[in-house]
Amino acid sequence: MDIQKIREDFPILSRTVYGKPLVYFDNGATTQKPRLVVDALVDEYYSVNANVHRGVHYLSQQATELHEASRETVRQFINAGRTNEVVFTRGTTESINLLVSSFGDEFMQEGDEVILSVMEHHSNIVPWQLLAARKGIAIKVIPMNDKGELLLDEYEKLFTERTKIVSVVQVSNVLGTVNPVKEM
C-alpha cells in the first residue's frame, strides 16, 4: 500500500499544520474527501443540484436517479442484499444515534447489555448512556493494554445472554489503533 499515493488523492492533505504534513483522524465527525469525490460534488452542484425524492421536475428526477445509483454502488461494495438495506446519513454520529433510537429503543429492555470499548469516540458513548438512563440497560466496557490494544480475553468475558449489541470503533481516531473487528 502506497500511503503517499493515497494522501495525494486527498487535496486537503497537501496542507501543513505547524510545519508538518496534516494528519486527520477525526473521521467520525467529518471525513476528508478524495479529489474524485470533491469533483463529483462540484459537478452535482453545477449540473443536477435538486432535492432527491422530493420533486417531479427534471433536475429532481435526475438527482434522484444518481442518488439511487450511488446507493446500488454502495450496496454492491458492502455486499448488502438489497438497496433498502443501505441508509445514507451525514456521518458516524447521526448513524449511531439512528441505531440507538431504532434498535435500542425498540429491541432493548431493562437489564439488556451493550458492549463498548474504552477507546470509543464520544459519539458512540453518549447515545448509549442516554438509552441506559431511559431504559435501564447496562453498558460494559472492553479494557485495553498499555499499547492501546483491546484485551480480547476480557472482551469475551463480558458476553452474557443479555448482551444485545457490540458497538466498537474499527480504527480509533485518538490512538490510531486498528481493532480486530473481524475476529471479534
Role assignments for model-derived ranges:
Residues 1-184:
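Pyridoxal 5′-phosphate
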